[in-house]
């Protein structure tokens, strides 16, 4: 509860280097029994990918994406796939969950990431709003894209941590340096 309050107040907790591949692995473990419902494919770069942040909070964003993707494909007549991919482009890390669910309306698509009524009967409408707040606290954002012929791509976009100098506790990434919160 305190973590959620921190997120909603937009306070910055103590951040550490986070291995994104490990973070995705933990999210897959905590997202429930995905393999019973869908086929899950992961796409990771060969090199280590680090971001500066709170691993648990970032994991919550990915778990939210995974659960939303499973809900989107749960009622499809045939078994569906979800792809979890980590892409690095210079100073940016993008963690995405791609599903093959039905197309979403313009109204629903426009409301993604905002505080709104949930389209799911189990949901409260807070999930993506909280995920968006977490992304912003980590100097990132959420991005959504429709897939063709159907489906959705939900992405967490964060600055990439390139170099860590432990002696003076400075964190560096492609776009510059910023002090740690220790």
Segments from the language model and where they lie:
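Conserved micro-motifs of the catalytic ATP-binding
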Residues: 9-13, 50-53
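A conserved beta-strand-to-alpha-helix junction within the catalytic ATP-binding
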Residues: 14-28
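Conserved catalytic submotifs in the C-terminal HATPase_c
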Residues: 39-49
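Short beta-strand/loop element within the Bergerat-fold HATPase_c
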Residues: 79-91
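Short conserved segment of the HATPase_c
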Residues: 104-116, 171-172
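Short alpha-helical Gxxx[C/S/T] motif in the catalytic ATP-binding
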Residues: 127, 131
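Detector for a conserved hydrophobic position within an alpha-helical segment of the HATPase_c
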Residues: 135-136
